[in-house]
Every structure is written in structure tokens, then in C-alpha cells.
Amino acid sequence: MSRQINTPDWILHANAPLRELNTFHIQAQARWLLEIIHPTALPQALTHPHIVGLPILVLGSGSNVLFAADPEECVLRFVNREVTILEHRIDHTLVRAGAGMAWHDLVLWSLQQGLSGLENLALIPGTVGACSIQNIGAYGVQVEEFVHIVEAYDQTEGKFVRLTASECEFAYRNSRFKREPNRYLITAVEFRLPLLHELNLNYAGISEELEALQITLPEPCDVAQAVINLRRRKLPDPEVLSNAGSFFKNPHLPREQAEQLRQHHPTLPIYPGETPESNKLSAAWLIEQCGWKGIREGDAGVAPQHSLVLVNYGEATGAELLALARRIAASVQERFGVAIEPETRLIGAQW
């Protein structure tokens, strides 16, 4: 970084390289990178002459973004990683975590405190701040089930706000924050975590993994370990093979259309959708049927372990990975008549 401006509450970097700040390890550079240590100083930092008026791009752990070009925005990172217990109740505990805390660290911390609810979401990359934007989910659980309050700076109103879970307007891999991307800067999230929680063991091999671990009466920490084992087998480690996890969302279709597809493709996995009239399809299955699993084109490719995961074998550019993703989606559309869309956020390009 060529130069930086330091204060006790925030640091502003000029011409900041972003390769180590995104898990695809794409070469990109931010004209300005603002790191927020204490979120209360956010209004002051945003009025600095170098960045005042610039659009803001919030970057958590960089685990759900693809830089197709250098960002034009001022890149903002929260580095507040504290977690505190706000209140104990008979059946639940309220917990507050800073936006910069790694999500998996929060899951492990909650289990160490004897709390439950987040165990199925173990090992998901990203930060606490990003979890509410994306409404992260895995193994039958979505984070919206446990979000109590989202604290954010409302850029439109110029003030800090506290939004309830209903005000966040959560949906499948979606939220108010995703639909209004330039309005809210999430600074912290409060979670309502139960003390006694019915474990969700009915999804994607968790029961089988617990059986392999010889656990007959599982506790939340056992479920978390099972999920960790499953994810490590299915998904490549970004520190070993650069990737951003699942690149595509599972498509949702009207139930009748999904059933018609299965008549032509009997092995097509179909899951319940968000409404009784809809179903969710496996994007991984659709992509694999089109022959993309394990494909490599230069340094851009599809992971051998999982067809939802695009990988950078070394020096692939964001534009090359995006071009590959578009070809994959086009082949699924042509063969099955189903549109698949990226779950990963695209920077410097439109889908």
C-alpha cells in the first residue's frame, strides 16, 4: 500500500491490493480501502475528503465476491470482532457480535458457551456482518431463524439504526440489505440463541456422519463437528485451492414445473421450496449433468469435489471465471430450461 492515514478509530489505505482480501485470490486493487475499528466513528470516517461522496463496497472476508474488475467504490472493512452476552433468559441468551468477527469463530464460541442453534452453520466462510446480508444457510438451517437485531449505519438517513428480524425482510439467500445494497452498513448483529434446541439432523448426511462418529445421543457440538467433516470433504479449502464456496444459487421453480422436469429426469433431486407451491432444485446436479464437474480451462475451473464451486488454480482473472460461469449457466438453460444465478457477488460486472 503506497500510503495510509491512521486514526485510533479507522485507517484509510490508498491503492490497496485486494488479492489477500478475497478467497478467489483475484488480483484487484482498491483506490481507497477504509478499515473501521470502532463503528461509532463511521460517520466521521466517511466524510474524509479523499472518500466523501464515493459509493461504498463493504468487504467482509471476501469469501462471497468475484472481482471481475477493480472496484470503483471505496472498499470498507469492519475489523471489530468482539462478542458479548447481553442477556440470559430461561430459554435463550442474547448475544451481540461485531460485524468483523469471522462467522465460524462465532459458531464455535456459542457452542463453548453451551448455546445452540448455529451448529448446522459451522465452517461457513465469511463474517458476522455478511451473514445477514446473504441470509446464510446450510444443512436445513438459515441464519434468519436466530437473528434478533441487526445494527447498521443508514447512509440514506445519516444515522445508526436497529432493525428487527422482520424488518430485515429475509428470504432465501436474500434480505433487505441485499435489495438496498447502497443504504445500510452493518456494524453488529444480535442473536437469540436457545439453551434447549431441537437438533436438525434430517439434511444431507448429518445422521450418517454422526453414526460414523459413533455418536448416538448427539449434542450441538457433535452436530457442528459432523457438519465440519461434511463440508471439508465436499468443499475445497480456499487456502489450498482458491474459491468462494458455492458460486450458484439453487433455483426455485413452481412445483408443477419441477415435477415435469423429474418425469424427464427421474434422478433429479427436488427439495421443498419457500412456499407449498414451489420446489428447490439442486444446481450442483444440473451442472454436473452438463459435464462441468472437474473441468479446467487455463487457471479457471470447476472443483473436482463439487460442481457448484468455481476455482482459481493460480492466476485466473475475475473476467475468466465470470466467462466460465456464464457458459455453465447457458448450458443448464439449454438442456433443462432452468435459469441458474450466481450466489457470489459480482464486482465490476453484471450477470
From Swiss-Prot:
- Catalytic activity from the UniProt record: UDP-N-acetyl-alpha-D-muramate + NADP(+) = UDP-N-acetyl-3-O-(1-carboxyvinyl)-alpha-D-glucosamine + NADPH + H(+)
Please list the residue ranges annotated as the FAD-binding PCMH-type domain. 25-196
Q: What class of enzyme is it?
A: oxidoreductase
On the tree of life, the source organism's domain of life is Bacteria
| Catalytic site | 173, 246 (proton donor), 343
Q: Where in the cell is it found?
A: Cytoplasm
Pathway in which the depicted protein is active: Cell wall biogenesis; peptidoglycan biosynthesis
The name of this protein is UDP-N-acetylenolpyruvoylglucosamine reductase
At the highest ranks, the source species' classification is:
Bacteria, Pseudomonadati, Pseudomonadota, Gammaproteobacteria, Lysobacterales
Q: Which gene encodes it?
A: murB
